[in-house]
């Protein structure tokens, strides 16, 4: 991934003129200074007030990014609802965003405000490598997540059995290795001592082939993969929803089957937030199942007692004795406690009823859990689609304008301030994922509240 620091340097050069070591004057991956030029800092391009304002805004962005992504990591590792193996991808993605905010953004801000590189040649190479690695890993993570979503939709049973935490962790390691393979070789193989500049600069290779290959390999190709995968996911989910609605789901007045907020269709029996919906009228809720069982058992015992009392009443009637309702009721209680054949029959029938009800509850609970899992999978797919869409929207302006610069150079170069805005919007993406999780996912929202307010209440108690 081409470093946004290069975009900053290009924008500074465009604004400062030919003496500012612009893109055409810089080489790749190093700190430059003119052989006979002064090493003193250049005249600042921002006023003191502008420097303070930009530092405050970017400082808030850094803190917000770190806090939000730390909350994501804590939520996934501590919340039972978020402990699914696939959420480890979000932990790794949040870690990359935290590293961007702590190891890249502060130096990009300093480079922008000072208009030259202050931190030396060694850290310039480290900074460029980390910048490219973290930003590339973000989009490779999203590609891996999209493939995970695709396999979980098309091979639900088989893939979910194979998707263990160990396999997910191995995939995450592979994602970081792929990102390193994409990021580091250009920084190492293309290093050369750059030409003279008015003051130290830190930037990547400026050759056309490198700009285009880095943009394609680090952004446009992964975006194409993600788009195709999610289009396939949508088609498969839509086809399954239509099939299920034709077989089982009731059709509304307008002929449309009920769907969830993500358009993928709701699993039957799954509530809005993935919890089991209340059962139909002829099926009692789980919380009253014990009371229902007791009522059925008492009814069975009463019926057995009445049958026995009726038999005894018939014999007594022959002797001139009748059996009223009280006797029948008494017989029911006696039958339920007596060791005779009738009592044994009543106890056996109550055991059979209890066994039947327990099997029915277990089956209903299993179906409920399966539908909850399906609903959560759909919500997770939708949230990740939003994450990918926001990522593309944030980074597309930078990569598009950067590619244009690589093709036609100054003829296609956008104004310097606009170019700076584009690459800082890309950095802002690192702070948006926690916001997306909070807005679109109730499990994350509940977990964030639990983490923040539980600790606050503990502080008040102490």
Swiss-Prot record:
Cytoplasmic side stretches: 77-88, 148-168, 232-379, 442-462
Ranges of Basic residues composition bias in the record: 294-308
Pfam families reported for this sequence: 7tm_1
GO BP term, pick one: positive regulation of neuron differentiation
Chain positions of site Implicated in ligand binding: 131
Extracellular-side segments: 1-51, 115-124, 192-207, 408-420
Gene3D superfamilies: Rhodopsin 7-helix transmembrane proteins
Transmembrane regions: 52-76, 89-114, 125-147, 169-191, 208-231, 380-407, 421-441
Protein family: Belongs to the G-protein coupled receptor 1 family. Adrenergic receptor subfamily. ADRA2C sub-subfamily.
The protein, known as: Alpha-2C adrenergic receptor
Organism of provenance: Homo sapiens (Human)
């Amino acid at each position: 991934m081409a470093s946004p620091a290069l975009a900053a340097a290009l924008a500074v050069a465009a604004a400062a003129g030919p003496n500012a070591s612009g893109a055409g004057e810089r080489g790749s991956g190093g700190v430059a200074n003119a052989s006979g030029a002064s090493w003193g800092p250049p005249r600042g391009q921002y006023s003191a007030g502008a420097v303070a304002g930009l530092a405050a805004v970017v400082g808030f962005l850094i803190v917000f990014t770190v806090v939000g992504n730390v909350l994501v990591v804590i939520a996934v590792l501590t919340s039972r609802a978020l402990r699914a193996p696939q959420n480890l991808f979000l932990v790794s993605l949040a870690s990359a965003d935290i590293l961007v905010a702590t190891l890249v953004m502060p130096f990009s801000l300093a480079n922008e405000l000072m208009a030259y590189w202050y931190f030396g040649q060694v850290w310039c190479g480290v900074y460029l490598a980390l910048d490219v690695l973290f930003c590339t890993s973000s989009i490779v993570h999203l590609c891996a997540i999209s493939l995970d979503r695709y396999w979980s939709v098309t091979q639900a049973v088989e893939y979910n059995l194979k998707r263990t935490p160990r396999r997910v962790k191995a995939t995450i390691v592979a994602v970081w290795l792929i990102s390193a393979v994409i990021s580091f070789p250009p920084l190492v193989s293309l290093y050369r001592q750059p030409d003279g500049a008015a003051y130290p600069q830190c930037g990547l290779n400026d050759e056309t082939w490198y700009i285009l290959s880095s943009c394609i390999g680090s952004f446009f190709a992964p975006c194409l993969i993600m788009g195709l995968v999610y289009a396939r996911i949508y088609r498969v989910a839509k086809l399954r929803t239509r099939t299920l609605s034709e077989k089982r789901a009731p059709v509304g007045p307008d002929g449309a089957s009920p769907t969830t907020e993500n358009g993928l269709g709701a699993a039957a029996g799954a509530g809005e937030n993935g919890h089991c919906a209340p059962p139909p009228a002829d099926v009692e809720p789980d919380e009253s199942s014990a009371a229902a069982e007791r009522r059925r058992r008492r009814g069975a015992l009463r019926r057995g007692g009445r049958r026995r009392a009726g038999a005894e009443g018939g014999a007594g009637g022959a002797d001139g004795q009748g059996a009223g309702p009280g006797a029948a009721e008494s017989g029911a209680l006696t039958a339920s406690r007596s060791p005779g054949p009738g009592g044994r029959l009543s106890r056996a029938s109550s055991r059979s009823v209890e066994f039947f009800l327990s099997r029915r509850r277990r089956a209903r609970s299993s179906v409920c859990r399966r539908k909850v899992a399906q609903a959560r999978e759909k919500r997770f797919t939708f949230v990740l689609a939003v994450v990918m869409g926001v990522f593309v929207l944030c980074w597309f302006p930078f990569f598009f304008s950067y590619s244009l610069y690589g093709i036609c150079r100054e003829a296609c170069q956008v104004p310097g301030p606009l170019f700076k805005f584009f690459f800082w919007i890309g950095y802002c993406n690192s702070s948006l994922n926690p916001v997306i999780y909070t807005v679109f996912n109730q499990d994350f929202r509940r977990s964030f509240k639990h983490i923040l307010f539980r600790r606050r209440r503990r502080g008040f108690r102490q």
